């Protein structure tokens, strides 16, 4: 195959293969929810004991596959399919559910809504994936590409399993030219007989059998059980064998490849088409190795996907939480406006955000020479100011003298600067000043977790305490830890 699609034979998409049963993932997620999402070794051992007694889960006895490894596989499955991610607080691992993960658990008794929610989870999945090291070689949205191909009329609305593990999973990145080449390659493969294609697989069985196993035994059944895929198992099979390990006395393990195919379920076709019109398969994924951002900030952004299109589709109220989650994206969008005409929108959404606190009154102040938002912390009648710093690039400096004048005008005690990212020297600009920094996605995450936990009485007290103890610093880490301690 041409290099336009391939790195080499060894660099292919790797799909998680630790479960093909959505109910098991649900049970693990519900267990985490009911146990404060702690995933320490002690908690994992307890999970192993509980799930070992479940009809859903019967782990094999193995010297290699210890209980800790087994549970890690299940947690990795949740993270892989975008239910959430792990973070640390006070040297303890916690699992943070994503907005879509929470929404999925909310509608467990509605199969139609679950199909649409999980479709969005797949749409949000990117390579490189934070929980799939082999995916770091790629730069695309794998399931957006799969869905795009399934909707391509030239391919008759279907993808044969053979086409996935022989052609598609070798795609490194995608653009229009590569996509057309991919379609052409698939159409050309359909000119071959099935005997010819299955014989090809036999000739390279040691290279392809793992992908056959991942796709046909795990991904396809999982998406079939969620009513995302319609599955045809074909009528021709070919046994493929895994390489035998050195010194093994057991016969090589066989897997069955067949001439089956998948289609998108009829009731999802229009919805997925709408999603792809909004979230293109050509979009560039977020880089995990962004040297300008902390890795946990990158992870937060990846898992913050929460499309209003989905909320409208399932009849979920398009509430303010969706705007909160979009703050980092809105910053980027507004800052690209050449005449900066959208900067006021960022300030307005922050005004709404701080008015979510029951003990804060926030008011946007228009005009030059003034702070962006004036706030009153009601329990002690103390004012503070907010400066909204939307910027296409990293915030390069803070004029602490100017912010002090802004505080003096309204008799504010301190200033909160909210920005997507900044250069390290900005920390020196606020050192020993009555100023703190918070990254936008950190604030969004804290407010969102309050909202989805049905905590409508959000108090500012904890944030106030953090600020008073950390003036002159970036308090994003402390706010993240607060989120984890309350909702992790």
Swiss-Prot record:
Under which EC number(s) is this enzyme classified? 3.1.21.4
The protein's gene is named hgaIR
Q: Which residues cross the membrane?
A: none
Q: Reaction catalysed by this chain?
A: Endonucleolytic cleavage of DNA to give specific double-stranded fragments with terminal 5'-phosphates
Q: Which UniProt keywords apply?
A: Endonuclease, Hydrolase, Nuclease, Restriction system
A Gene Ontology biological process in which this protein takes part is: DNA restriction-modification system
What is this enzyme's class at the first EC digit? hydrolase
Name of this chain's protein: Type II restriction enzyme HgaI
Does Acetylation appear among the keywords? Answer: no
Organism field: Avibacterium volantium (Pasteurella volantium)
Q: Name one GO molecular function term.
A: type II site-specific deoxyribonuclease activity
């Amino acid at each position: 195959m041409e290099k336009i699609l391939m790195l080499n034979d060894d660099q292919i998409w790797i799909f998680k293969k630790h479960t093909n049963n959505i109910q098991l993932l649900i049970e693990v997620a519900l267990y985490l929810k009911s146990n404060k999402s702690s995933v320490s070794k002690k908690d994992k051992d307890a999970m192993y004991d509980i799930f070992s007694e479940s009809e859903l889960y019967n782990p094999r006895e193995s010297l290699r596959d210890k209980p800790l490894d087994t549970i890690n596989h299940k947690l990795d499955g949740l993270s892989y399919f975008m239910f959430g991610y792990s973070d640390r607080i006070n040297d303890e691992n916690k699992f943070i559910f994503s907005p879509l993960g929470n929404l999925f658990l909310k509608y467990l008794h509605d199969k139609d809504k679950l199909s649409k929610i999980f479709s969005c989870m797949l749409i949000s999945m990117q390579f490189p994936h934070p929980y799939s090291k082999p995916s770091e070689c790629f730069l695309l949205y794998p399931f957006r590409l799969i869905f795009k191909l399934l909707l391509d009329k030239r391919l008759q609305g279907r993808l044969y399993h053979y086409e996935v593990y022989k052609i598609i999973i070798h795609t490194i990145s995608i653009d229009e030219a590569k996509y057309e080449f991919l379609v052409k390659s698939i159409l050309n493969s359909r000119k071959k007989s099935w005997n010819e294609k299955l014989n090809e697989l036999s000739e390279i069985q040691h290279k392809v059998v793992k992908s056959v196993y991942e796709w046909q035994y795990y991904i396809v059944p999982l998406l079939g059980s969620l009513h995302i895929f319609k599955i045809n198992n074909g009528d021709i099979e070919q046994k493929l064998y895994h390489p035998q390990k050195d010194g093994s006395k057991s016969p090589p393990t066989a897997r069955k490849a067949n001439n089956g195919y998948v289609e998108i379920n009829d009731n999802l076709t229009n919805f997925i088409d709408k999603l792809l019109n909004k979230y293109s398969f050509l979009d560039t994924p977020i880089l995990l190795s962004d040297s300008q951002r902390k890795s946990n900030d990158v992870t937060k952004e990846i898992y913050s996907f929460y499309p209003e299109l989905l909320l409208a589709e399932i009849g979920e109220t398009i509430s303010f939480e969706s705007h909160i989650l979009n703050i980092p994206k809105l910053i980027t969008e507004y800052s690209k406006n050449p005449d900066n005409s959208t900067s006021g929108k960022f300030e307005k959404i922050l005004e709404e955000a701080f008015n979510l606190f029951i003990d804060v009154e926030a008011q946007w102040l228009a005009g030059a020479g003034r702070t962006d938002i004036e706030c009153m912390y009601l329990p002690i009648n103390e004012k503070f100011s907010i400066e909204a710093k939307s910027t296409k690039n990293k915030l390069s400096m803070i004029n602490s003298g100017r912010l002090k004048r802004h505080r003096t005008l309204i008799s504010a005690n301190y200033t909160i600067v909210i920005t997507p990212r900044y250069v390290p020297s900005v920390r020196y600009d606020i050192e020993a000043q009555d100023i703190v920094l918070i990254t936008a996605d950190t604030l969004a995450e804290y407010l969102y977790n309050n909202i989805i936990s049905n905590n409508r009485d959000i108090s500012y007290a904890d944030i106030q305490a953090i600020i008073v103890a950390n003036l002159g610093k970036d308090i994003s880490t402390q706010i993240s830890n607060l989120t984890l301690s309350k909702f992790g």
